[in-house]
A protein has these predicted regions:
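Intracellular juxtamembrane helix-capping segments at the cytosolic ends
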Residues: 117-130, 313-327
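Helix-breaking motifs and short loop linkers at transmembrane-helix boundaries and internal kinks
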Residues: 44, 76, 97-102, 131, ...
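Helix-to-loop junctions at the C-terminal end of transmembrane segments
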Residues: 64-76, 261-273, 356-357
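Extracytoplasmic gate region of multi-pass secondary transporters
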Residues: 32-33, 209-252, 256-259
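C-terminal transmembrane helical hairpin of 12-TM major facilitator-type secondary transporters
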Residues: 272-319
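Conserved MFS/SLC helix-loop-helix module at the cytosolic interface between two early adjacent transmembrane helices
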Residues: 63-102
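Helix-loop-helix hairpin linking two adjacent transmembrane segments in secondary transporters
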Residues: 132-133, 139-188
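Cytoplasmic helix-loop-helix junction between adjacent transmembrane helices
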Residues: 107-142
Length: 391
């Protein structure tokens, strides 16, 4: 019996639909970075505005992580899910039709809104249906990585072969519309499978040690994850003086390793406790982070990139599973969790940028060691907390 064998027909349809939506989330995430050079070339915008466009997407995502929890209570999970997912279409259309800075910023913000709310809802729905099954959560995350691998090529092919980057936006908008239709067919919330916690407005989850440990872990992880993804091309270009093709290839290699790692994690997640699995991944991340920032040889650097991708791959989903029972119990726990943890993805890359501006990328990238060490400490505390609960 496969990973989904224990679920009924309606549950399988929901999980399969969320896999597709997570694939789209991967596309949305990488399309932001892939579209900016095309938008800059088309509309002649400045580097400052280009940076603001990327930030607008991140800010929109963080804000909607919290707002989406309240809109689900007010509108119902399905209606809120569909309406907020539709914002990605609004955002893609906005950046397609005009080079007006305000419209571009609004478009990227809407894309961020859709990413934040859709990720929140999808994780919560699958977490509730599977009762925090780490294998299913990791398999869903693998679809995100697959979408992330494909997105840059979709924009590149559209711009080079079809002659217009806008075709990529049109295609992704149609794919998003299909995702909304699939959600309409799902039976959850008020018309089927129960999702969300019983305690709708209760904030007592803030008193739970497991919640804070999981939050600290995801804060450190997202800081490492977004920093590696965001700075890897610049790091290889400037620290190793490689070609753009080689540096871009390293970014693709990183995502390929993440994809393979998530598939592996989905297969072995049930063979050990979630806390211990997170600890093992944290150890691997610490080791390969140390190798990554050491700059010994280019060969070791490439190996460290692969190693980081493999060990980063399953941590995110497992940390969500670690706090899964709390998410099921408290309606607002998911939203606050994603909002607060999102600051890790904002602060860490910015700190690296500030240090790199003064001392070079070789020094700035070493900030990753602090986050990796902190994640390892938090993972050890998490294992101890579980052992204490067992006794």
């Amino acid at each position: 019996m496969g990973i989904l064998g224990k679920f009924n027909r309606d549950e399988k349809f929901i999980i399969g639909g969320e896999f597709y939506i997570f694939f789209l989330l991967g596309v949305y995430a990488l399309m932001v970075g892939a579209l900016v050079p095309q938008i800059r070339g088309e509309y002649g915008i400045s580097y400052e505005l280009s940076g603001l466009l990327i930030s607008a997407s991140s800010v929109g995502m963080i804000a909607m992580n919290l707002i989406s929890s309240y809109t689900a209570i007010l509108l119902g999970m399905k209606r809120a899910f569909m309406l907020q997912h539709a914002l990605v279409i609004v955002g893609l259309v906005a950046v397609t039709i005009s080079g007006n800075p305000v419209l571009l910023l609004l478009g990227m913000t809407f894309i961020g809104f859709a990413r934040g709310s859709t990720s929140n809802y999808s994780n919560q729905i699958v977490n509730d249906i599977t009762k925090s099954d780490a294998s299913v959560m990791n398999q869903m995350a693998a679809f995100f990585a697959l979408g992330a691998c494909i997105a840059p090529f979709v924009v590149l092919i559209s711009a080079n072969s079809a002659g217009n980057w806008r075709y990529a936006n049109y295609g992704v908008s149609l794919a998003a519309a299909a995702g909304i239709f699939i959600t309409l067919r799902m039976k959850f919330g008020n018309d089927g499978i129960k999702t969300g916690g019983a305690k709708r407005g209760d904030l007592s989850f803030f008193k739970r040690k497991k919640y804070w440990i999981s939050l600290a872990a995801i804060f450190c992880y997202t800081g490492i994850d977004i920093s590696i993804i965001g700075w890897i091309v610049t790091f290889f270009l400037e620290a190793w003086d490689t070609t753009m093709q080689f540096a871009s290839g390293m970014a693709t290699l990183l995502w390929a390793a993440i994809l393979v790692g998530r598939i592996i994690c989905s297969l072995i997640a049930r063979r050990m406790t979630t806390a211990r699995f997170i600890l093992y991944l944290s150890i691997g991340m610490a080791v390969f982070t140390a190798l990554f920032i050491s700059e010994i040889t280019l060969t070791i650097q490439v190996a460290a990139t692969i190693g980081l991708g493999l060990f980063m791959s399953g941590a995110y989903s497992l940390i969500l599973v670690n706090a899964g029972p709390i998410f099921s119990e408290y309606k607002l726990a998911f939203g606050y969790f994603f909002m607060l943890s999102g600051f890790g993805s904002v602060i860490m890359p910015a700190v690296i940028g500030v240090i790199s501006e003064r001392h070079g990328i070789q020094i700035g990238i070493r900030v990753l060691a602090v986050a990796a060490a902190a994640l390892l400490v938090v993972s050890i505390l998490n294992v101890r907390l579980d052992k204490k609960a067992e006794n």
